[in-house]
């Protein structure tokens, strides 16, 4: 224990530090350091990760919390936290400095430094003549807590700098401490540090010149090297400073906001009061005894764990949403809580699922419960601003999300830093198949022409591998709020988000969980927006007011389930994906709980655990159902003896192996990370022995453990599925009974779901719904329903669909539109201020009432050409100098302007033009026999590569009659890589496979027909 490193920047000093906090703390422990201070620049974003690594690896090294600052280019220093007061002070200083600037910047003031009362200050002389001035100033205000930090990096001026620092220390009576200025945990990271510096400066490594580190001395160094560089007293001083720093992150305590409690109530009694009121609402005919017992058990544990404020906070937020007419739904493990149901946080009746409160709160786990609440995605901002207004920005902020380098950004940024041409990087990225899990991207790069033996090629691959996973910047969490009783900046630094009126803390959800700090998840869901808009449309056109509760009371509508069983579920929540639609005709959901199973079973967990086929066989009566005991039957009876849900695994561990609720939840957590650390295997002996002691066969015990491992990190909770099933049924019901309203609502709620507006419009047309084009005289901003002379409702497309049309342009167009409509294009031109707006309208053919075709409309848009000198010298021309666009050209223009076309489908159009060979259409596949050879052609509208599919990719092709499911095996994708990666219009020759009503085409040959489209097709949606 010879040394404490007091100045060390991790990769949370973005594009400066070249090692993760975890790597630094582990290496410091390996080298025998007494302490390590993670001191990122004006940031505490990396400290929790180092703290967690110490616990996980049981390290002896001590972590010191601190931060590095630049007051300006001439004054730099490190602040360290000796105690809790100093930590609060540091958080406040970082917050103030960050809040003064835009995201990613900070500005420290001299007053910030002068007002320090608790932090220890290590001044880092720059070697400039101004050092004496700064030493004078710092000594005047911080003499009692001030050290001079001496760094030695073996540069050409090292001896001069050493003498300079010693002179300053003697002159101002400053103790000297050794400092490393560490940027890397090992010297081998120097090339990566150079690369990060080049990225930061926007140049190549070769262009950095003197900005490059001259050596790897800014890594964690050995005792032998440090003793050569620093005097013993300077090393000893680092240990003395470390001895002053007793602050530990575990000492942080979260205090809940208290203003929600009315006079005369305690937090416990007020929660009980609200639950009592909720019981009357949720159970008007009386609370069943079993439910009442569960409520009392939950309330007792909530009180014991001191969580009433948490539940009251969530209740307050959802009540605000309810009062404002904002649809919401609690989900996740909260659906395991009857208290949450009574508080109207969740909508899943506990009598409909197997409630497992241990999944929600556990005494042994001793950490805050997790309640996710989804709000309409277009109105969630109202909820967020309510939280800010109620608690103030000093007490409420969003959690951070760490945006890290992923493959594409890593390749592009590293390549630029190494001087690789951007065209070559584009070529690499376009032609690397990341879905191919056997032929890694490294090997594919070599195939594409990268020279692996060249120095640049070796560096490129190594640097890309190293930088993937490195943090790039902090972004805002999708909705995780941290709300505190006192100023939040005394708990964690707060900074500005990129979005206006948003602030974020410097920790992400994993950091908060590690420190057992509470966050409230205020999430968004597009389907809730679509459902509300659908309800409003139904009320407008049918004078019927509906709610989600009204629809869920009709959960046994077999007409809806017949539609679901046919996989007619495009646009339906959670059961619209390719995999779900393939399963629906096999599982044939016929009730609400079937939907709960349907949503959960099409997940990697049940698939990897080999639970899907046994369940389907038992459901179809092809396999007997048996249980080794009554206790196991109680757990698995609803899923026919096959564990489908996480909760069932937990319950099995409890009833069959004697696990406590907390131990079983620890098993669940180990399941979630077993591939990373293998912790699940430490439960194997206890699980199997516990089952053997209770009379179960070894074969059964081992099979259960194998299924647990199969669940792995993909196990799906019944509570999640139950919440999702409510919206799945609701959206299916709306699609069945009010299809026009449903499709209009979906189109007006984009972006959301699996399908593009083009695909939704095609599906609406297949359901017999007329879709009308955008019209300057009849369209609104959003898509709307209009009644035809036949009495049927049709969808009129809205201006929001037009690319390049500004919001201001739409507003002016609608505000000034005469009652009788616009009579000529020049009238519109006088209203719209931006030329691009009127050009966009013409390109989208929105003037079809005022001009014969879009080409003529464009010409009229440019009718001021005669005023230009060049055109005044030309002879006059007719008013209609251009030929009409062909049908094919119109389709091209439609896609370019709006992303969809109401004209004939491109496949049908190309066939009529003789551009396609003979093929089978989507609606003809059901007439083909099993294992027959077929040829299909369609626009590539979707690709999915599930992590458990062993390299298989599922394509969705769309022709003029419907969608075609294509399975592409890995060998096929490798052999025909170009067509696989880039085709937008694809011909597939393959074998048709039929299983009941499920039809797939197993691809044999892929033929890229994209050139026939000439830019026609919409880009496919790809899901990994």
Curated annotation (Swiss-Prot):
SMART domains: POLIIIAc. Signal peptide: none annotated. GO terms for biological process: DNA repair; DNA replication. GO terms for cellular component: cytoplasm. Keywords: Cytoplasm, DNA damage, DNA repair, DNA replication, DNA-directed DNA polymerase, Nucleotidyltransferase, Transferase. It is an enzyme of class 2 (transferase). Belongs to the DNA polymerase type-C family. DnaE2 subfamily. This is Error-prone DNA polymerase.
């Amino acid at each position: 224990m010879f040394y404490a490193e007091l100045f060390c920047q991790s990769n949370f000093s973005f594009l400066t530090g070249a090692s993760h906090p975890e790597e630094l703390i582990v290496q410091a422990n390996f080298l025998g350091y007494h302490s390590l201070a993670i001191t990122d620049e004006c940031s505490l974003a990396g400290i929790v990760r180092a703290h967690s690594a110490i616990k996980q690896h049981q390290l002896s090294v001590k972590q010191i919390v601190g931060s590095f600052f630049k007051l300006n280019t001439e004054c730099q220093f490190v602040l360290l936290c000796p105690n809790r007061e100093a930590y609060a002070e540091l958080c406040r200083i970082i917050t103030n400095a960050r809040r003064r600037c835009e995201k990613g910047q900070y500005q420290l003031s001299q007053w910030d430094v002068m007002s320090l009362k608790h932090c220890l200050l290590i001044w880092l002389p720059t070697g400039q003549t101004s050092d004496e001035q700064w030493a004078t100033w710092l000594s005047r205000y911080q003499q009692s807590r001030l050290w001079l930090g001496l760094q030695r990096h073996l540069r050409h001026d090292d001896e001069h700098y050493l003498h300079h620092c010693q002179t300053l220390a003697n002159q101002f009576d400053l103790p000297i401490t050794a400092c490393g200025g560490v940027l890397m945990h090992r010297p081998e990271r120097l090339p990566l540090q150079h690369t990060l510096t080049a990225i930061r400066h926007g140049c190549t490594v070769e262009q950095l010149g003197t900005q490059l580190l001259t050596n790897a001395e800014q890594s964690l160094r050995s005792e032998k090297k440090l003793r050569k560089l620093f005097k013993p007293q300077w090393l000893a001083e680092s240990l003395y400073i470390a001895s002053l720093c007793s602050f530990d992150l575990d000492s942080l305590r979260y205090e809940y906001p208290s203003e929600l409690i009315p006079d005369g109530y305690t937090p416990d009694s007020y929660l009980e009061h609200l639950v009592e009121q909720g019981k009357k609402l949720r159970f008007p005919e009386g609370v069943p005894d079993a439910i009442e017992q569960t409520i009392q058990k939950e309330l007792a544990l909530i009180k014991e764990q001191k969580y009433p404020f948490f539940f009251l906070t969530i209740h307050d937020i959802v009540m605000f949403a309810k009062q404002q007419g904002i649809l919401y739904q609690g989900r996740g493990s909260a659906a395991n809580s009857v208290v949450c149901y009574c508080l109207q946080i969740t909508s899943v009746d506990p009598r409909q699922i197997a409630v497992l409160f241990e999944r929600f709160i556990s005494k042994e786990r001793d950490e805050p419960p997790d309640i996710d609440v989804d709000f309409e995605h277009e109105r969630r901002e109202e909820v967020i601003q309510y939280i800010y207004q109620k608690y103030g920005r000093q007490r409420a902020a969003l959690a951070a999300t760490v945006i890290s380098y992923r493959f594409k950004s890593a390749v592009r940024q590293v390549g630029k830093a190494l001087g690789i041409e951007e065209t070559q990087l584009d070529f690499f990225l376009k032609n690397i198949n990341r879905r191919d899990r056997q032929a890694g991207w490294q090997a594919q790069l070599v195939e594409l022409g990268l020279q692996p033996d060249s120095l640049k090629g070796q560096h490129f691959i190594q640097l890309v591998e190293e930088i993937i996973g490195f943090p790039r910047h902090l972004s805002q969490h999708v909705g995780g709020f941290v709300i505190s009783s006192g100023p939040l900046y005394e708990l964690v630094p707060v900074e500005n988000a990129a979005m206006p009126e948003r602030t974020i803390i410097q920790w992400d959800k994993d950091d908060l969980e590690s420190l057992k700090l509470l966050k409230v998840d205020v999430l968004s869901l597009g389907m809730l927006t679509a459902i509300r808009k659908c309800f409003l449309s139904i009320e407008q056109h049918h004078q019927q007011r509906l709610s989600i509760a009204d629809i869920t009371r009709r959960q046994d509508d077999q007409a809806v389930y017949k539609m679901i069983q046919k996989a007619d579920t495009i646009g339906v929540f959670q059961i619209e994906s390719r995999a779900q639609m393939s399963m629906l005709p096999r599982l044939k959901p016929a009730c609400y709980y079937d939907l709960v199973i349907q949503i959960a079973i099409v997940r990697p967990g049940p698939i990897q655990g080999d639970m899907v086929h046994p369940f389907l066989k038992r459901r179809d009566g092809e396999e007997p159902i048996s249980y080794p005991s009554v206790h196991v039957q109680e757990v698995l009876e609803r899923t026919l003896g096959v564990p489908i849900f996480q909760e069932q695994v937990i319950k099995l561990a409890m009833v069959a192996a004697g696990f406590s609720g907390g131990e079983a939840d620890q098993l669940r957590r180990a399941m979630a990370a077993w591939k990373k650390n293998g912790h699940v295997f430490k439960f194997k002996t206890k699980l199997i022995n516990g089952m053997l002691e209770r009379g179960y066969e070894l074969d059964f015990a081992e099979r259960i453990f194998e299924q647990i491992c199969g669940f792995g990190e993909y196990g799906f909770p019944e509570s999640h599925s139950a919440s999702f099933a409510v919206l799945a049924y609701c959206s299916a019901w709306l699609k069945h009974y009010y299809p026009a309203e449903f499709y209009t609502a979906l189109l007006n709620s984009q972006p959301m779901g699996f399908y593009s507006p083009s695909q939704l419009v095609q599906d609406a047309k297949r359901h017999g719904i007329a879709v009308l084009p955008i019209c300057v005289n009849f369209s609104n901003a959003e898509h709307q329903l209009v009644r035809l002379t036949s009495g049927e409702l049709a969808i009129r497309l809205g201006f929001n669909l037009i690319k390049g049309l500004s919001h201001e342009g739409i507003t002016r167009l609608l505000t000034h539109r005469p009652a009788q409509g616009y009579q000529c294009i020049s009238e519109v031109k006088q209203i719209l201020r931006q030329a691009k707006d009127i050009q966009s309208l013409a390109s989208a053919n929105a003037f079809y009432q005022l001009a014969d075709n879009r080409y003529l409309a464009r010409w009229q848009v440019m009718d001021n050409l005669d005023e230009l000198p060049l055109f005044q010298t030309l002879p006059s021309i007719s008013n209609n100098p251009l030929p009409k666009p062909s049908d094919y050209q119109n389709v091209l223009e439609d896609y370019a302007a709006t992303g969809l076309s109401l004209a004939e489908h491109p496949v049908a159009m190309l066939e009529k033009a003789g551009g396609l060979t003979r093929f089978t259409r989507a609606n003809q596949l059901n007439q083909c026999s099993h294992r027959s050879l077929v040829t299909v052609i369609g626009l590539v509208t979707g690709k999915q590569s599930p992590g458990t599919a062993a390299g298989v990719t599922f394509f969705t092709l769309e022709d003029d009659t419907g969608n075609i499911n294509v399975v592409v095996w890995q060998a096929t994708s490798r052999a025909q890589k170009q067509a696989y990666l880039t085709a937008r219009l694809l011909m597939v020759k393959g074998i048709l496979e039929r299983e009941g009503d499920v039809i797939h085409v197993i691809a044999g040959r892929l033929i890229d027909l994209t050139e026939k489209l000439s830019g026609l097709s919409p880009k496919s949606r790809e899901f990994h």
